[in-house]
Amino acid sequence: MDVGQKKRGADKTALATTDEQGALSKPTWIRAKAPISPEVGRLTGILRDLHLHTVCEEASCPNLGECFKRGTATFMIMGDVCTRRCPFCDVAHGRPAALDTEEPGHLADAIGAMKLKYVVITSVTRDDLEDGGAAHFAQCIESIRKKTEGVKVEILVPDFRGHVDAALKNLGNCLPDVFNHNLETVPRLYAESRPGARYHESLRLLQRFKETYPGIPTKSGLMLGLGETDEEILEVMRDLRVHGCDMLTIGQYLRPSRHHLPVQRYVTPEQFEAFRVAGLKMGFSQVASGPLVRSSYHADLQAKEVLHT
């Protein structure tokens, strides 16, 4: 495969196409506003002018319209081609291009132009880099803080598989305000839904970051509907607390296309609320739990209490 060439859909996941007639119907509570407004066009224009990507667009997030209308976005750095091919995700797979050394500056310029005060920076997984891209994260944070004033930065990182020591060291060059790494699902479903990832290694990443930088809040996210049970979710939540995770997001998995993993169930708003209450009882400082919640959805509001801003 050529550098920069993208694989999506069936080419990426290698899953058999599923008959849509057999798919579960979306319930009435799965509703997201269409991303059509002048503000969406304005923000998209800024991003394209600076050659930036948002996970909102690349992962077909159901909240894109609402978040763009509010003037917020989650930036995806290090390109838009991922070295992994998770069958729940709509980000393209392939051989990524070299890092763009001008990206940190462009990112800071975009944040200034968009007048943001809280930003989330995430990335594709870059198994091809010696530190998984951690130094690039730190460079982006440093550039934001040099060019803007008072902006809080949350990073949503991959698992840095095989590069954790180097990643933790390089992140220390310029630390975020919040460190986020998603477990995504329960350990029983990892082989199918997160090929290449390891449940306990992801837990350990959260724990090691907390041990290394104890003053930085940690966060993780789960998506429901891949075939997990309620008790399995509660067990993962307990594991996260044991490993020092402070904040949690829980949302509904929505299938990007018929070439991705099918939705096994739609969790009711009442059950999402039960998970939220259970999480607070376990000791999470903040739990956002609902059908359309994503790890970066209203991240500024969730972090407000923790960061005392």
Swiss-Prot record:
Keywords (A to Z) from UniProt: 4Fe-4S, Cytoplasm, Iron, Iron-sulfur, Metal-binding, S-adenosyl-L-methionine, Transferase
UniProt binding sites for [4Fe-4S] cluster 1: 56, 61, 67, 296
Subcellular location: Cytoplasm
Cofactor, how bound (note): Binds 2 [4Fe-4S] clusters per subunit. One cluster is coordinated with 3 cysteines and an exchangeable S-adenosyl-L-methionine.
Binding site for [4Fe-4S] cluster 2: 82, 86, 89
Molecular-function annotations in GO: 4 iron, 4 sulfur cluster binding; lipoate synthase activity; metal ion binding
Radical SAM core domain ranges (all copies): 68-285
UniProt EC number: 2.8.1.8
Superkingdom field: Bacteria
Keyword Cytoplasm: yes
Family that this chain belongs to: Belongs to the radical SAM superfamily. Lipoyl synthase family.
Stated name of the protein: Lipoyl synthase
Lineage: Bacteria, Pseudomonadati, Thermodesulfobacteriota, Desulfuromonadia, Desulfuromonadales
